[in-house]
A protein has these predicted regions:
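Active-site-proximal alpha-helical scaffold in enzymes
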Residues: 89-103, 267-271, 278, 284-318, ...
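ACP-dependent fatty acid/polyketide chain-elongation machinery
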Residues: 1-78, 120, 129, 133-186, ...
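Glycine-/small-residue-rich "gating" segment that lines the acyl/pantetheine channel
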Residues: 148-151, 248, 252, 299, ...
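Phosphate/pyrophosphate-binding loops at sites that engage ATP/ADP/AMP, CoA/4′-phosphopantetheine
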Residues: 96-114, 277-278, 369-374, 404-421, ...
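Active-site pocket-shaping loop/turn-to-helix segments
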Residues: 73-91, 153-155, 199-202, 210, ...
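Condensing-enzyme catalytic core mediating Claisen C-C bond formation in acyl metabolism
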Residues: 9-13, 30, 36-42, 338-414, ...
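Acyl-CoA/ACP chain-elongation machinery
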Residues: 43, 309-333, 337-350, 384-396, ...
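Active-site-proximal gating segment of KS-fold condensing enzymes and close homologs
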Residues: 123-282, 327, 332, 431-444
Length: 533
């Protein structure tokens, strides 16, 4: 082996998991000991043939931890304002702290030398969907109200005009079709009414008078003492708005129907909440790299630690539970299985399964942390190589992944023949064949290969964390945990290599080096190289 370019050794000193059928790492490891699938039918469209990985999670389990450290209302605030994507990350982070007692205090005491790099692949689709629907319903009611005759003189005149004049008015204004002239059996009447009201509400004289009154209410600023005055002003404005709306009898304004929880759940909030709950004051950033996200966050930590900017980092990814939007989007991209059966890598290439959950690690300068009595988990982290295909948004290239692998090996000082096991991204699509060819072009064919999306599905960004944790859990103890795969299922074109694929029985291993690659939507690749301590 070549000497590493940097001397700082990096270890894992805490990890937490939220995954299908796995609320924590202990259950995750136990489940991995059996070659089964953790997928279940998806009910988001009503009956369908989709299988998904639904995370097993109860945020209430973490209430005692939060109550012990914060004011009594903190848990209820988090529970009501945070979506599950944030909650999964919080739960996994709290799990991390249990692995090495005392590390929580160190994260706080290190100040700017403790970093947080936790991102997401999709954002909180389920929460966004519900809140957008709420706004949309409010906007429809609002438009309909201000298009009534008593609030819209122009539309009132239009309605009593002759058919010829109505056509002329619509043509002159460029108005959408009048729903009064639509056959509901031929066209969607609801959408026609919605487009009609959305056009005419802009010309409502009643609404313009209302907005003039509203400007008077909203135009008042803070006077006198700012700290005392701001609260009084907010309450006074709320009261004045209620009186104004009662006077007009109007529904809730659409801007008042937009829930601020949309803002409290933007992509950097999982990292931000970890920072606040852990009182970690160093840089807190949300890396976004789709399916390669976990190893990209690990790469950021490695770089920060080896450059001397950080001693310890919280890293990871979190994804929402499967939702109609995520399942439908993956299906529309033609990468999702929809036949009611588990689709396994290297078999029928029928597509993958959407999953959600979180994986959070605490990584750091191993000598520094072990010197303080903390014990490393799993494997030593040697390197992460990152590259981009700069080609297709979803179909992997040859050069991009190979470049990431070569970078990681070079940075780790590892020769290809030193790699004993390799975990693949493998989404049970035709891309599995390309990925296998890329792997074998750089690495020797004697290594043992794992691919686990047939077990727990594909979390958009968290999948790499689950897969890397599974590799660490087994390989650090001298074995590769079984995979939900049988030899007779392997695709004919891949069958010449099937003996290298870890299948439904654990496999003892020789050697010390493990590798892992993930390839993300957009063409980003991340390859991690690790070694037994």
């Amino acid at each position: 082996m070549k000497a590493m370019a940097e001397n700082t050794r990096i270890g894992v000193f805490g990890w937490g998991i939220v995954a299908p059928r796995s609320p924590d790492v202990a259950v995750f490891e136990k489940n991995l000991g059996r070659a089964t699938s953790w997928l279940e039918p998806f009910a988001g469209f009503g009956p369908s043939n989709f299988l998904v990985g639904r995370p097993e999670f109860d945020f209430g389990f973490y209430k005692p931890w939060i109550d012990e450290r914060f004011e009594p209302r903190r848990f209820s605030q988090l529970n009501s304002k945070m979506g599950n994507t944030v909650k999964y990350a919080i739960g996994a982070f709290i799990q991390c702290l249990e692995k090495n007692p005392g590390i929580e205090s160190l994260l706080r005491d290190l100040g700017a030398q403790a970093h947080v790099y936790v991102g997401t692949g999709l954002g909180d689709f389920p929460l966004q969907y519900e809140l957008v629907l709420r706004y949309h319903r409010a906007q429809k009611k609002w438009n309909q109200f201000w298009c009534r005759d008593e609030h819209h003189s122009e539309l009132r005149s239009y309605r009593v005009a002759t058919a010829r004049d109505r056509k002329r008015i619509c043509d002159d204004l460029g108005a959408p079709p009048d729903p009064a002239g639509i056959d509901p059996d031929v066209e969607d009447l609801d959408e026609t009414v919605e487009r009609w009201n959305a056009f005419w509400v802009l010309r409502s004289d009643g609404l313009h008078r209302y907005l003039e009154r509203s400007r008077e209410v909203e135009g008042e600023g803070v006077t006198g003492d700012i700290d005392n005055g701001k609260g009084l002003l907010i309450r006074r404005k709320i009261s004045s708005r209620k009186k104004l709306n009662a006077e007009y009898g109007c529904p809730t304004e659409p801007w008042n129907a937009v829930d601020p929880n949309l803002l409290w759940n933007i992509p950097n909030i999982p990292a931000a909440q970890i920072s606040m709950l852990g009182r970690i004051t160093g840089p807190t950033i949300a890396p976004i790299a789709a399916c390669a996200g976990f190893s990209v966050s690990l790469k950021m930590a490695i770089d920060a630690i080896r450059s001397g900017q950080a001693r310890i980092c919280v890293i990871g990814m979190t994804d929402p539970e499967p939702h109609a939007l995520s399942v439908g989007a993956f299906f529309g991209a033609r990468v999702l299985s929809h036949d009611g059966r588990v689709s396994k890598p290297f078999t029928g290439m029928r597509g993958t399964h959407v999953s959600g959950g979180a994986c959070i690690w605490i990584v750091g300068d191993a000598e520094y942390l072990m010197g303080k009595g903390f014990e490393p988990l799993g494997l030593e982290i040697l390197s992460v190589g990152v590259s981009s295909d700069a080609d297709h948004i979803i179909t992997p290239s040859e050069e991009g992944p190979r470049l990431a692998i070569r970078q990681a090996l070079a940075e780790a000082g590892i020769e290809p023949e030193d790699v004993a096991t390799w975990d693949m991204h493998a989404t049970a699509t035709p891309g599995d064949w390309t990925e296998l060819q890329n792997t074998l072009a750089v690495l020797p064919g004697s290594m043992a290969i794992t691919a686990r999306k047939g077990t727990f599905g594909h979390g958009m960004s968290v999948c790499g964390g689950w897969e890397l944790t599974a590799q660490h859990l087994g390989f650090s103890k001298g074995a590769l945990l079984p995979v939900n795969l049988e030899g007779n299922e392997v695709h004919q074109q891949i069958r010449p290599y099937y003996r290298r694929l870890v299948q439904d029985e654990a496999r003892p291993t020789e050697g010390d080096v493990a590798g892992k690659i993930n390839m993300g939507v957009g063409g980003i690749n991340a390859c991690a190289i690790c070694r037994r301590w």
